Amino acid sequence: MAILVTGGAGFIGSHTCVELLEAGYDVVVVDNLYNSSKKALDRVEQITGKHVTFYEADILDREALNAVFDKEQIDSVIHFAGLKAVGESVSKPIEYYYNNIAGTLVLCDVMRKHGVKSIVFSSSATVYGDPAFVPITEECPKGKCTNPYGQTKSMLEQVLEDIYVSDHDWKVILLRYFNPIGAHKSGLIGEDPKGIPNNLVPYVAQVAIGKLECVGVFGNDYDTPDGTGVRDYIHVVDLAKGHVAAIKKMEKSEGGVQIYNLGTGKGYSVLDVIHAFSKACGKEIPYVIKPRRPGDIATCYADPSKAKAELGWEAHYGIEEM
């Protein structure tokens, strides 16, 4: 069985490729390398001793996608490709809506044309907006998303649900992740963004090695124990294993739309993460308090019990191991 992984050279994508290969799947990756590197896939091959078929292509490029589906025997798609920085999405809404929405529509159209109707979609806890309650279950109403990035995820969930309504042969699994951090135990792959990182942990790491001066903590006046934002940080290997569990679930299902939260069920503040990192690397991480970022919320963590019950999946790593 070949699984097409869009955005497979990225942080979560590359870790998912490792888990898929180790579970015995053939993996085909489509990635435009906008915020990733082919080196990640070379390292995936090094870790697993298995081959990854790679196409450098954009999901907006219908011709390129058609060529991939013509050439490869694709059974299912795991769709990661897209722009993903919350803060940047506020300043570049047109790019985010165009890339994420139009790209996914092109992908789904090409899938339909080739009779491939199984997709695991990389969604996000941002679809809950400022959540009505925590811990967040899948029944928590989708809120008003506080940024265009979250809005694209919410809209694409609706698109995929509508596709299923129109054609009951489709199998759709929406995975709403919380905050992925950490790296593969080999140390060969991890989060390696081009330019200044948008996510907390790679930023902290670059401060730790002296690449950046100090960590900017956006807001310390939230209604949380230490005033900084609380998030559910999930190890990327746990998250990757969740995608394999979703593919296995889809193989046995008849069709339909399933939604799962992938998180640990525990919330940690920004300062908790900085202090844990300081402890792990044995040096103080300097930080400075900055104004809140537009689109950020106070508290967000998962109730992951549905994924445990239905996918047989749960997170194993704690914050110290991340």
How does the language model describe each region?
Residues M1-A183:
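N-terminal Rossmann-like NAD(P)+-binding domain of SDR-like oxidoreductases, especially those catalyzing
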Residues G24, G150-Q151, G195, T264, ...:
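Residue-level detector of secondary-structure boundary/capping sites
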Residues A57, F69, Y96, D192-I196, ...:
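Pocket-edge positions in alpha/beta enzyme catalytic cores
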Residues S91, N99, G143, D167, ...:
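A generic fold-level signal
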Residues Y97, T146-S154, G190-N198, P202, ...:
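Short-chain dehydrogenase/reductase
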Residues G182-H184, D221-Y222:
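Short, basic/glycine-rich phosphate-binding loops at helix/coil junctions
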Residues S186-L188:
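Catalytic core of nucleotidyl cyclases, primarily class III adenylyl/guanylyl cyclases
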Residues L200-M322:
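C-terminal substrate-binding subdomain of Rossmann-fold SDR/epimerase-dehydratase oxidoreductases
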